Curated annotation (Swiss-Prot):
Expressed in vascular tissues of stems, hypocotyls, leaves and flowers. Expressed in the vascular bundles of xylem in shoot parenchyma cells. Expressed in the remnant cytoplasm of differentiated fiber cells and in protoxylem element of parenchymal cells. Disruption phenotype: Reduced levels of lignin in leaves and stems. Reduced seed germination rate. The gene is ET2. This is Protein EFFECTOR OF TRANSCRIPTION 2. Residues 380-396 have a biased composition (Basic and acidic residues). Contains a bacterial GIY-YIG-like domain which can functionally replace the bacterial GIY-YIG domain in the UVRC protein. It comes from Arabidopsis thaliana (Mouse-ear cress). GO terms for cellular component: cytoplasm; nucleus.
Amino acid sequence: MEFGDGVSFAVVPTVFKREDYKRTKHDTVFSKWQVLIGSNDWEDFKNGKDGVGRYRVQNLPRKSCPGLYELGVAVIGQEQCRKLEPDIVLASYLGQAESVRSRLQRYGRSGAHLRNVNNLNDCETIESPVKAVTGGLFEDIFSKGGSILYRWAPMGSKREAEATEGMLLSTFDYAWNKGSNGERRQLDLLKKLGDREFMSKRKSGISRMLFPFLRNQVGIRIKGEKHVLKEERKLTCDVDEEKSNNFLTSILKLTRSRPQPVSDRFDEVDGSCSDIVCGVLLEDGGCCIRSPVKGRKRCIEHKGQRVCRVSPEKQTPPKSEIFTGQDHHNHKDSDVVCGVILPDMEPCNKRPVPGRKRCEDHKGMRINAFLFLLNQTDREKTVKDEKPDPESHTESIEEEALTRFCEATTKNGLPCTRSSPKGSKRCWQHKEKTSSDTSPVYFQPEAAKNVACGVKLGNGLICERSPVKGRKRCEEHKGMRIT
């Protein structure tokens, strides 16, 4: 600038020391401060402490994109671990990278180019690897109990990040940046980090916390990709919300699993008092109708037991499952019986095993299991022995039609049990066969009333031994088929 006497003066732009200002005009573009390396992370990792890494991977940016980043130092107390205030952070370095996430990872693993600098000896780069370990920038901060923090601002491209970095370096003097700012100021940074009076002045007053426009902001305004930071915050909030929901869910599960008070009293109720009963199946086939203990499903006698079968109505035992062609007046309808049709065409009236439908002799059998073991002669005789009721002639005709069988011999030697259509002796599959084809092959006439094993022997005869109870074959031929 020239004046009247021809004397010119150079206008030197104002350069602010970055660590002296906690609020800047470019704060709106940057993210919040995050811990990159704790004060003891490297030492704990070197000693093999469980669950400790060299740096905080969980605090890195979730997306990899070009941008600016600032490194800062701070002494973090236990009460400040969860929420970091910018008042305690001294910004010390500004950089740019094609991938900010990858650059921060290199800082966390080894300190990158900032670790190989001995700042206590004229800030010169050290060639010896032994001295580099003991005299780096990060180690000096760790010795004072400080931690390394970062914040970043995403940019559209690397060229845009380089241009913005040059603008900020011409406005601020970062203690760790070297070049246009001159030499690194590590000693100055360490002195301010340990100065309690200096750090106390940085804390915001109540008036500035309530009225942000009163805060002293310096520097220049820059542009950045703010939508990337919004997506980052959204992902972080979703993760935090999921963690809090899982924590609340675990608390609710814990409260629900607390034991309920149990009373030793129980009352016997009848069918009209209450619909809630114990329901455990008793040995006599009935169900326990006592009122359960308060807060439980069973009475005091059956606590902890499972229900094999519960009656749908109280004091009403299950209906009997009987397959029979005639009435049985010697049993009540409500009695539970086995119901398997015996060879003499009478149902088994034994009481079933508790929890099952059949008695001990016929367990696992179907109702008409013995019907397949009868030959043609036995079945004809049993059908003829059934005399129809003269008073209900129409019903007897229908029953006779239902009990008419095809009687053709199948490939395995057993008679066909399909019902033949009205006016025909054979079913639809065996209507071409004659009566000679349906003659029994493996039963002797004199053993018509007895159920035999029926397996063909080597000499051409048929085994006529009585089968084992509940099976089709004798003890010697059990599991064999008729060929």
